[in-house]
Design a protein with these regions (language model features):
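Membrane-interface helix-loop junctions in multi-pass transport and translocation proteins
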Residues: 1, 60-63, 173, 180-215, ...
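Helix-terminus/linker motif at the lipid-water interface of multi-pass membrane proteins
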Residues: 38-79, 129-138, 196
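Membrane-proximal transmembrane or re-entrant/amphipathic helices at the cytosolic face
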Residues: 249-303
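Interhelical loop/hinge segments that connect adjacent transmembrane helices in multipass membrane
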Residues: 1-44, 94-104, 224-236, 280-288
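Interfacial segments at transmembrane-helix termini and the short loops linking adjacent helices
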Residues: 58-64, 124-154, 160, 200
Length: 303
């Protein structure tokens, strides 16, 4: 309503000259997005439903209690999804308007974007225990759900990015089928993983379910626009993050040190991509000081 009033959108509505062909194209493009969004909701909501129904009485807690802890576990991974939403809003216009060298453009932006997300994910997993203790002390046990929910949120951000390939090619039905595949597989995995591993199994199911969507969309993006996600690099990052998550959950001696070292390894491995984004943002945010900082770091790297 606010946008309608401030933008005077009624000036752009012409009821007399209705273009039926354009109307049909818009419907074909937009209608599949509704069940696709519902499928995304199913992936998140099914976790809570399965945990509530299957974990009642586990360790003396009701199903509602476990469901509440799982909801609290989303607290830190929300940082990633918020970052992804901000980026997607800024990126969407460029994705549509950039026509020359689109494959190279998408590949370059994804590499930088994924580098930032991988570093953030590693930091969240490493620090989730102390942060949950300070911020959500009454729900401290919820930290167990954070590691794989963070991995799931990373996949969700990637899926949102790759959805741009469907927008560019007006192939929204592919968005529906990929999300539907993720939703169905997530429900199936929820049932088995929760039986095997308890409520933490729901977070693993979310990671694998959204991971399936990511793989399908990466293949589509490659076929549609020639984009490459550099699968070896992405698999290595996810492998290290999964290892960090498992280490944190297993709690071996000095687990904080080992997870910290893995976080440092992720940051070093992705530093080039992170610095590429920082080089663009720092001058805009800090002005002259930002340019001086960029110059100093560039000189240090060259040495």
């Amino acid at each position: 309503l606010f946008l309608c009033i401030t933008g005077r959108l009624w000036n752009y509505v012409e009821l007399k000259g209705l273009n039926r062909d354009l109307w049909q194209q818009m419907l074909r493009f937009s209608l599949p997005m509704i069940p696709a969004q519902i499928s995304f909701w199913v992936i998140n909501a099914s976790d809570l439903f399965f945990v509530r129904e299957m974990c009642g009485g586990l360790d003396g807690h009701s199903g509602d209690a476990w469901s509440g802890l799982l909801s609290t576990g989303y607290f830190l991974p929300t940082i990633l999804t918020t970052l992804g939403l901000i980026f997607y809003d800024a990126w969407q216009l460029s994705a549509v308007t950039e026509e020359e060298g689109r494959a190279r453009f998408f590949t370059k932006i994804f590499r930088t974007y994924s580098s930032v997300l991988f570093c953030c994910a590693a930091g969240i997993i490493w620090l989730c225990r102390p942060v949950m203790h300070v911020m959500k002390a009454n729900y401290y046990y919820a930290w167990h759900f954070v590691p794989f929910l963070t991995l799931a949120s990373t996949c969700s951000c990637f899926n949102q990015f790759l959805n741009s390939a469907y927008v560019v090619n007006k192939k929204s039905t592919h968005s529906l089928w990929t999300m539907l595949a993720g939703a169905v597989s997530n429900c199936i995995m929820n049932y088995f993983f929760i039986k095997w591993w308890g409520p933490i199994g729901a977070t693993v199911a979310s990671f694998f379910g959204l991971g399936i969507v990511f793989v399908l969309r990466a293949l589509d993006a490659h076929n549609m626009i020639g984009m490459s996600i550099h699968p070896g690099r992405v698999a290595l990052n996810f492998g290290v993050l999964a290892g960090e998550a498992l280490l944190l959950l297993a709690e071996p001696p000095l687990y904080g040190l080992w997870t910290g070292l893995l976080t440092a390894a992720i940051i070093l491995f992705n530093f080039a991509g992170v610095w590429a984004m920082a080089r663009m943002l720092l001058p805009k945010l800090l002005g002259r000081r930002g340019r001086a900082l960029v110059s100093a770091v560039d000189n240090w790297i060259k040495k």
